[in-house]
Regions:
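Catalytic-loop of the protein kinase fold
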Residues: 119-140
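Conserved structural core of kinase catalytic domains
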Residues: 66-105
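Regulatory extensions flanking the kinase catalytic core
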Residues: 240-258
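ATP-binding glycine-rich loop module of kinase domains
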Residues: 5-60
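C-lobe/activation-segment region of protein kinase-like
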Residues: 144-146, 151-241, 245
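Conserved N-lobe motifs of Hanks-type protein kinase catalytic domains
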Residues: 61-65
């Protein structure tokens, strides 16, 4: 990101940036403890417009506590709830460096359930996320998961504007509920193991293995591993069944599957 080429919201600059992606720049508005997401460059406005329409749809449907709250538009961007603990991937990276920050199986189960509940609501509103990774799931002040980043998502069957990482990509139609379910399986795998599936392999090799139905081993992950495999193998038709399976795990999601 070249600072002097970026479009900042009025009154904000490089010092206020908390995150950026391929299409959007996120700055912190300290006065309201919200963030403003704007197009990174002029040619990114289509993606941000898509995201705005999706947030408006989700808000019209009542919103959901596991999705970043939408606070309307700002210039060509949108104002969203601020998640002070960053994204889940940042937390996973931090625990590698500092063992005292290691997350627990109970925390993993909570995140999995919160993300699944968010996705069930998202799909009910005619939205396919299409880019579900730990980078797009944020943590609020109480470390509750919040799904976000709809700039590449589909609304009412429109084309996806982004491709998800190979480790999370469904070996079938990606513009589908099953595409998000497959990615969810990879998200939970990363949360429970600390690394994306097949992290050591090239994108081409990952794609080839997925097409052959060869997925990362989850035997050591107990009941959570069973859910992950069912996501990858297309054994769920929607998130409602996933939510039921996650709730049935009780307090011991890593206990051996029966």
């Amino acid at each position: 990101m070249v600072a002097d080429e970026v479009k900042y919201p009025a009154g904000f600059g490089f010092k206020d940036v908390v995150s950026h992606g391929i299409s959007g720049l996120v700055v912190l508005d300290k006065s309201s403890q919200t963030v403003i997401k704007t197009p990174l460059f002029d040619d990114c406005e289509v993606a941000l417009s898509r995201e705005r329409h999706i947030y408006e749809r989700l808000t019209q449907r009542g919103g959901h506590e596991r999705i970043l709250r939408y606070h309307g538009t700002v210039e060509s961007g949108i104002r969203l709830e601020y998640a002070p603990n960053g994204d889940i991937r940042r937390t996973l990276c931090a625990q590698e460096k500092e063992p005292s920050m290691k997350t627990t199986p109970k925390q993993h189960q909570q995140w999995a359930l919160q993300i699944a509940e968010a996705l069930a609501f998202i799909h009910s509103a005619g939205v396919v996320h299409g880019d579900l990774t730990c980078h797009n799931i944020f943590l609020d002040e109480n470390f509750n998961a919040k799904v976000a980043d709809f700039a590449g998502s589909s609304l009412d069957g429109t084309d996806l504007l982004v491709c998800v990482a190979a480790s999370h990509e469904y070996p079938g139609p990606t513009l589908s509920v099953k595409g998000d379910i497959f990615a969810f399986g990879s998200v939970i795998y990363e949360i429970t193991t600390g690394a994306a599936p097949y992290k050591e392999l090239s994108d081409d090799e990952i794609e080839a293995r997925y097409k052959r139905g060869e997925f990362a081993d989850t035997a050591s992950l107990g009941q959570m591993g069973v859910v992950i495999q069912k996501c990858w193998r297309g054994q769920y038709d929607g998130f409602e069944a996933i939510i039921q399976d996650l709730k049935a795990q009780g307090e011991n999601p890593i206990m051996p599957a029966t």
